[in-house]
């Protein structure tokens, strides 16, 4: 019995670890390529490849195609996939004017909200989570104060914070809805439907409204879209499998490793640098999650 439980635990952690690693790579790539292309064009071209990757798995591993295509179920998947598209769009908009560290700060806030919503009944007294919230709140307030103080006249800073905040609000709803639907649909079904929806919406919006691409210095090549699509395809499927075996709280808590890896990648590969106060605020918020039970 102990061996079976240990295997299940290791399998669950393996899925979440793989998802975390590839989400970190994905976030880093978004931060680089979002400055080379318009958001809709970038999302559309990336979703072509992700639809192919996940689509192949869908063809071979989908257990019940009729269940996915049934009217009510199809609308449910369309709804949750639309939320994912909106979150992705605002994420790319945020990266056009913001940085990895800014985005990771909002990931930490997202984890707080998802953790409290999905695991609130486990907190018997206020004292069990108030210290964590105070620490996280102080770190975030400290970060925002120095960001606004340093970039007082820079409107792009305000916009990037707004975009990242809106993106994370959509992602909160997305994770909670996906967790609910995983009791009915497989991870492959949800991932494939989501990528098709992203491709459909981005293509439709591009057709209706042409994007301005005058800021692009060098066009993104097809093989670069392939490189962007592969990490997120692996991350999505691994994350959904891990989410199916755990719950949104553990998925988000384990994902706290992601912001750290993303920041390290940005510092090492992209030479992204920030003031000491920014990194200090990030560390203070991470300490808050230690109090939360990390």
What are the roles of these predicted feature ranges?
Residues 2-41, 132-136, 153-189, 227-230, ...:
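Glycine-/small-residue-enriched transmembrane alpha-helix faces in small-molecule transporters
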Residues 12, 21-29, 36-86, 134-142, ...:
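Transmembrane alpha-helices of multi-pass small-molecule transport proteins
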Residues 12-19, 58, 65-90, 157-169, ...:
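Loop-to-transmembrane-helix transition segments
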Residues 24, 81, 85-86, 111-116, ...:
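Hydrophobic/small/kink-forming positions within alpha-helical transmembrane segments
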Residues 35-41, 90-106, 122-124, 183-190, ...:
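Structural motif at transmembrane-helix junctions in multi-pass transporters
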Residues 49-53, 106-121, 197-201, 235-238, ...:
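Alpha-helical transmembrane segments of compact multi-pass small-molecule transporters, enriched
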Residues 54, 109-116, 125-147, 277-294:
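Hydrophobic transmembrane alpha-helices of multi-pass small-molecule transport proteins
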Residues 62-72, 119-126, 151-152, 176-189, ...:
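Membrane-interface helix termini and inter-helical loops of multi-pass transporters
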